Every structure is written in C-alpha cells, then in structure tokens.
C-alpha cells in the first residue's frame, strides 16, 4: 500500500521515498560537497515539481532533518544557515537556508549512471527516478531507521560506521562468523547526541540475536 511504502524505510538504502527523491534531485543538480551551496527553496521546488508533489513544507522538513547532526548520526546533507537546534528552535525558512550533499552521500550513487539499480516513471511519467539508491554502505545500521506503517513498525538505532566496516570485513573474511565474534567489534548503538548506554553483554547479545529489546541512556 502507499501508506506502507511511504512510512517504512527501504532496507537497501535506509531511505523513505521523500529522502531518496531529495538526494537524487540534489545529485541531478550536481550539488556535491565540492560545489557551492544552493538555496533550499530551489531544491524543494525541484523535488516537488519532478518527483514528490506532496507539499513544500514536508519536503523541507525532511531535508532539514538530514542536515541536523543531532538528529542523524552521519548527515546526508550539508546545510548552511539556521537548520534548528537540539533545544527545539525551528530552522529558518527555506528561502534563507542553503544546502549541498555531504561527501558520505557519494556512496549512494555508485554505478547509478550504469543502470546499477532499476528506475521507474515519476508521478506524471515525464521523468525517471530510482527505485532504490545503490548505497555501498549499510546505511540502515549506520543511521538507524524509524517508521510506523499499517500493522508494523521499526526502530533501529544508529551504529558507529568504523565498527560496522570492521564487522563487514570479518564477515567477508570469515563466512560463518559468530554473533559473539561480531559483537566483539560492534560495541552497540552509537547515537548522534552521545551519552552512555546502559546495557550488559548478555542483554546486548539477546537484542542482536532476536532483533528486539531496549536500553537506557545516561546523558553526559
């Protein structure tokens, strides 16, 4: 259903449709880290006109969140201007703020020009958009995921990118690496705001084994 597709993130690139469309539009505009910033109003207009005709404010809110280092473990968007803060102050209007892609986001486009992923028609059949972005990194574990849809929900915490890469190296090198071996590398979730996670080793193992559980966080 459209509710399910719009609410749950795709496991392959950890993006909801609105996030994917923002990033792909910025890719088409060549807003890479090495380029100059562009007004968010222009980016939002491009996304809404080509791919996501669901209101400019919803698009802008999603763009802002991808640029907030207190909301996202590794930001996908490099924002310039007032993008809000952790105390709850709102970002400036899109006509004042500017954005471009982060270097990290380059890993989402490997081979996209060589048909490494499928494309589909946009809402009016005038443009093509990727079904999923060819991310080289496990972004769903790096930045976590949260979504609620009809009959299901997910809440995956973010993790440290260096620990995940080391764990992937172990899995590639040793096909049947045990969970115990993997958890010697991955210490647990790594949240954007820092803090101390209260979780003993047995609880941690059960959470990663079963995919369910909870933990407490002490602020620094």
Task: Report each predicted region and the residues it spans.
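Active-site cavity-forming subdomains of large catalytic enzyme subunits
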Residues: 82-123
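N-terminal cofactor/phosphate-binding cores enriched in small/glycine residues
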Residues: 14-40
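Single conserved hydrophobic/aromatic residue that forms the stacking wall/gate
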Residues: 1-6, 11
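Intrinsically disordered, low-complexity regulatory segments
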Residues: 49, 53, 118-143, 148-220
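Short, conserved phosphate-binding/catalytic loop or strand-edge motifs used
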Residues: 19-21, 38-46, 77-85, 146
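Extended, well-ordered alpha-helical scaffold/bundle regions in very large, multi-domain proteins
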Residues: 32-70
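Non-catalytic interaction/clamp surfaces of large macromolecular machines
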Residues: 50, 60-64, 70-95
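Residue-level signature of catalytic and energy-coupling elements of molecular machines
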Residues: 22, 67, 151
């Amino acid at each position: 259903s459209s509710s399910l597709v719009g609410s749950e993130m795709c496991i392959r690139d950890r993006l909801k449709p609105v996030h994917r469309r923002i990033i792909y539009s910025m890719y088409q505009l060549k807003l890479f880290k090495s380029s100059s910033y562009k007004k968010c109003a222009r980016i939002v207009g491009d996304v809404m006109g080509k791919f996501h005709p669901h209101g400019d404010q919803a698009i802008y809110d999603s763009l802002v969140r991808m640029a907030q280092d207190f909301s996202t473990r590794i930001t996908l968007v490099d924002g310039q201007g007032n993008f809000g803060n952790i105390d709850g102050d709102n970002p400036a209007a899109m006509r004042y703020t500017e954005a471009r892609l982060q270097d990290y986001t380059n890993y989402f486009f490997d081979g996209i020009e060589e048909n490494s992923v499928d494309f589909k028609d946009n809402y009016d059949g005038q443009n093509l958009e990727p079904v999923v972005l060819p991310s080289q990194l496990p972004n769903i574990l790096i930045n976590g995921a949260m979504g609620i849809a009809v009959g299901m929900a997910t809440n995956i915490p973010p993790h440290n990118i260096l620990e995940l890469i080391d764990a992937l190296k172990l899995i590639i090198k040793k096909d049947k690496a045990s969970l115990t071996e993997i958890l010697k590398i991955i210490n647990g979730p790594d949240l954007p705001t820092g803090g101390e996670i209260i979780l003993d080793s047995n609880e941690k193992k059960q959470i990663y084994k079963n995919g369910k559980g909870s933990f407490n966080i002490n602020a620094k």
